[in-house]
Amino acid sequence: MQYHDQFDVIVVGGGHAGTEAATAAARMGMKTLLLTHNIETLGHMSCNPAIGGIGKGHLVKEVDAMGGIMAQAIDHAGIQFRILNSSKGPAVRATRAQADRLLYKQTIRHTLENYPNLQLFQQACDDLILEGDRVCGVVTQAGIRILSKTVVLTAGTFLNGLIHIGMEHYRGGRSGDPASVTLAERMREMPLRVGRLKTGTPPRIDARSVDFSQLQMQLGDDPVPVFSYLGKPEQHPRQVPCFITHTNVQTHDVIRANLDRSPMYAGVIEGIGPRYCPSIEDKIMRFADKDAHQIFIEPEGLTTHELYPNGISTSLPFDVQVQIVRSMKGFANAHIARPGYAIEYDFFDPRDLKPNMENKCLQNLFFAGQINGTTGYEEAAAQGMLAGINAALRAQDKDPWAPRRDQAYIGVLMDDLSTLGTKEPYRMFTSRAEYRLLLREDNADLRLTPVGRELGLVNDERWAFFNHKLEMMAQEQQRLQDTWIQPQHPATEGLNKILKTPLSRPASLEDLLRRPEVNYQDLMAIEGVGPGIEHPQASEQIEIQVKYAGYIDRQQDEIDKQLRHEETLLPLDLDYSEVPGLSKEVCIKLNDTKPQTIGQASRISGVTPAAISILLVHLKKRGLLRKSA
């Protein structure tokens, strides 16, 4: 049965990757179809009810800078906002928000249902339509064939999903949703490298059964931050506290006594779990010297009693889960509303992807999200947007786009995945970015909004807002440079109160702001100096640019040197075993990965600088030295 319409882009899956992929393609004017097995679960938070965090918040800001929907959704659904690492340098500061799970899902669905160029269709995808090595559509569970110029696959944990609670297991994409078995088996017949990963989630607790007087309260920040560059605090719903408790010796004894009933330790689960979000069983075994682990008690929403105990993800049997929960302070009489579980699922080796997220073997097919071996809503959203952008470009026969490592965390993410691959669920951290001083949360718009506008992702409202901010910053930066304070100036008395050493010679406001003990707000509060600009994001960027100018310039110099050969293209049909001088090990790794650029090749483990020099000489001799567009 043929569907009555054809599309430029079909997105399979309505999670965090799928929704960003679909909206990105639609913003670029593409006729887009979002295919989901259940419209009711669009934007559903399968695990923790939160957005952001170290490295993750940076990704959300980058998606927002290019017009994505995640940041604006959490601004309308966030019930607690905090800036993490607020006392540290600007490179590692990150926004994190607790979400009302239901409100977030409702916001995403409302956004999608009212998005121009985007249609929703509730059908599971069972197959891809192929013409040779080219994908040209999908086949649904009901046998409906839908044609499209490109397909973006964002199936999350649904491909051959297997849920484990103790020794019991059953098929599922997540709790309450069916696994995608037919599509998974069909994908295994294609020329794709497939592996298994696992992730898990903790039991949910009924708040009415918890003694909060025994817990430590954790409040959000005041003033309340926003996530989107267009966000306003008044968009936030009512703010609520989180709480903290700890595991203890009794908890750990219960877990150790029941490890033989853990599917992970009994060898039932084959997939590798996330290193940086381990199960409570893993924590107890890996950190055997610790008598306690901190557990964050997070509300699931304003209209539910469910709590999310962040830190006790487990696949132990239900009776053991009850013992674990009730051993913690404040939880002696706790009622578990939903048991925790682990889920195994298929993923595809991301080294089989080009940097633009298109599969190397199958044209017009793009992968995004957990099927690429990542973990986390934010990593999925970033990949989804990039895949949606490039599916739209491919549908228009335009050149692909992928950010470099020095341009965006999205670039770091995709370069790591497509070059190095992953054997465990990949999570973003600021430590993964060598140029993190330039890739801050505060300047994601400066880095990516102009690119987004050029690609057709940024609408007039966002573009006008961005340019107004640039104007304000330019005018204020000029004022700071041109305004000088003399030692005898009336403002000096107030100024000396915040300076470590009194002002003894003329200084510009920019010079004063460069001092570590002076911040922009304090400087503007001095009579005769202010009022300055009230836009908090603009003033923050001005202060960072002034204080860190030397470090930023030095890092930019490093980037300029690195870029000399970073984008030199490598022929995809190059047989590295025929390049004289390369070791057998290097040849195997290069032939296995097929890097697209010298930059990618240089980041493959075992490929030495000497090997890169040999490659460059080989390319030059054969007249193959050329840069990517």
From Swiss-Prot:
Cofactor field: FAD
Keywords assigned: Cytoplasm, FAD, Flavoprotein, NAD, tRNA processing
InterPro entries assigned to the protein according to its UniProt record, in alphabetical order: FAD/NAD-bd_sf (IPR036188), GIDA_C_N (IPR049312), MnmG (IPR004416), MnmG-rel (IPR002218), MnmG-rel_CS (IPR020595), MnmG_C (IPR026904), MnmG_C_subdom (IPR047001), MnmG_C_subdom_sf (IPR044920)
GO terms (BP aspect): tRNA methylation; tRNA wobble uridine modification
Positions annotated to bind NAD(+): 273-287
Pfam families on file: GIDA, GIDA_C_1st, SAM_GIDA_C
Cellular localization per UniProt: Cytoplasm
Chief localisation class: cytoplasm
GO MF term (any one): flavin adenine dinucleotide binding
Annotated positions binding FAD: G13, G14, G15, H16, A17, G18
Transport keyword on record: no
Extent of the signal sequence: none
Any single GO CC term annotated in Swiss-Prot or TrEMBL for this entry: cytosol
Role description: NAD-binding protein involved in the addition of a carboxymethylaminomethyl (cmnm) group at the wobble position (U34) of certain tRNAs, forming tRNA-cmnm(5)s(2)U34.
Subunit structure: Homodimer. Heterotetramer of two MnmE and two MnmG subunits.
Family, as annotated: Belongs to the MnmG family.
Protein name (Swiss-Prot/TrEMBL): tRNA uridine 5-carboxymethylaminomethyl modification enzyme MnmG
Organism field: Tolumonas auensis (strain DSM 9187 / NBRC 110442 / TA 4)
Gene assigned in the entry: mnmG
